[in-house]
């Protein structure tokens, strides 16, 4: 497992999940889909946000990817869609709605809370 994932806070984990899901949904190549889904699952394993937040992001990704992004030459810009998605404020809205850092008492480990909610 990538060591960096242990250093991300809850917000970073959730945004990285959203980006992974977007990439996996944006491309038809099985290798890309599989890698993106494995990455998304890793972020879920380390995160503490509710499952409803992940489901809500999946729905928002599906809607976002319906937007038409074309380069000057007419080629699709799927990665750009995903970058715009995670920077659009949509992911932050969902995170804020389900933010696991709102209540320290819900955490079993105070040190983990301090690390993940910085």
Give residue spans per PLM region.
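N-terminal secretory signal peptides
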Residues: 1-42
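Compact alpha-helical subdomains of small soluble proteins
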Residues: 36-118
């Amino acid at each position: 497992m990538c060591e960096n994932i242990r250093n991300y806070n809850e917000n970073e984990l959730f945004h990285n999940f959203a980006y992974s899901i977007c990439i996996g949904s944006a491309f038809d190549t099985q290798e890309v889909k599989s890698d993106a889904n494995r990455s998304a699952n890793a972020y879920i394993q380390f995160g503490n946000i509710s499952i409803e937040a992940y489901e809500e992001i999946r729905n928002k990704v599906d809607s976002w990817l319906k937007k038409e992004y074309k380069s000057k030459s007419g080629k699709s810009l799927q990665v750009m869609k995903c970058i715009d998605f995670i920077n659009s404020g949509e992911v932050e809205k969902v995170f804020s709605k389900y933010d696991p850092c709102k209540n320290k008492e819900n955490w079993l480990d105070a040190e983990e809370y301090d690390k993940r909610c910085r």
